[in-house]
Amino acid sequence: MNRNVSASTMTRGQCLRSLAAGSSLLPGLLSELLGEDSGIRERNPLSPGIPDGRPRASRVIMLYMSGGVSHVDTWDPRPKLMRDAGKTVTVNEFQGRKGSFSMYLKSPQWTFRPRGKCGTQVSDLFPRTAACVDDLCVIRSMKSNHTNHYEATLGMHTGSFTFARPSMGSWISYGLGTLNRNLPSFIVLAPQTPYAGGQVWGSDFLPGAHQGTRVVPGTEPVANIQRRSASEELQLLELGLLARMNQRHRAARGDDALLEARMQSFKTAFGMQKEMPEVFDLSDETESTFRSYGLQPGSTSGFAWQCLVARRLAERGVRFVELIDTGSSGNWDAHGDMQTHAPLAANVDQPTAALLQDLKQRGMLEDTLVVWTTEFGRTPFNAAPQAAGREHHHWVFSSWLAGGGVRGGMTWGASDDYGIEVAADEVHVHDFHATILHLLGLDHTRLTWRNSGRDFRLTDVHGRVVHEILS
């Protein structure tokens, strides 16, 4: 007997019986959607996990600057580069090509000054964030594997510079689950599609429940978040019928990760309809909060909006929130003119500082790890002496961490005199990831998923926790 009855052949009696059966599931469905059934919690892939060790942080807010921020113009003062500007230097790689190249040193374009009690030097590009430097650990010895945007962006997000793999946010969701069953565990605030596209928040072979949910600043940050049904009661009736059909389908198919992920997505979506509008409703924020972030009341876009919404998501238990400031255009990729860094820095500087101060005032910075990074740096040299821009540079660049078990007011690692290569205490992207996982109580060597006959992990077969920067 064919049990697949199409809508066009379903009789009135069959339809009524299905609706009645669906309505009988409403009490159990409502309990499931609200997370009240312990058995369902055990099946829920987003249930809170148990860390391997003692976590210093319970959540992450990652600020990603797309395009490649120049380290020698922002976080890594190179006085000798300034003194020797215009002189030639021989390098072994340029624009991805190996060989011996004679290049002209290019001076930093902004002045560096000692900041805070710690005296860490930061350039004038980030005056407000620099005022928070006593809470920052600036890493000046970051290193990536690739000089192209696509591969470097993929590597910073997934640990793989060649093939699509689960993103860091997905790994953290898999390891720790969510603290709020009405919200996704991993949310990305992205006004544009970045280099490498949606792979930067994809879950790849991990269950689909762990992929990032993209929020696009605007009047409808999450598509279809508003209920289309006439009432909540009618929606519950629809969900009851759908749950019954899915459960029957699951029983016939056995284990099916895609089906489980789809079923979980309906539960999460129902919860999001209740809680997401509240996250985006900023009417309960004070005027002083709006001023500190540089956000106009009523605005629903811009990096300031992203930062304030990120704080509200973190407050509500979202494990991993990523903010991408731009996308694959109009970003920090300053080939033609380094002065394009100025408006981009002005766009992110005040809200970044406000986010750090806001988290600190609310007592959240202690267990919130804030990560600021980019895919690579920019060359301290150029092929032409009068070139106004800088090229891609993956041999060394800068990132910083704050809160969540990190020692503030310090720098770690160093580039050489000209900012060309790592001179001390290299922190590869794999080490960066291992350290972030460690701060969350996750052992990067044990957080694995078996796929195609081998165990995969975020750090592949590499990675060292940088214990020296931990508080």
Predicted features along the sequence, with ranges:
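Ligand-binding pockets and gating/stacking loops
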Residues: M1-S471
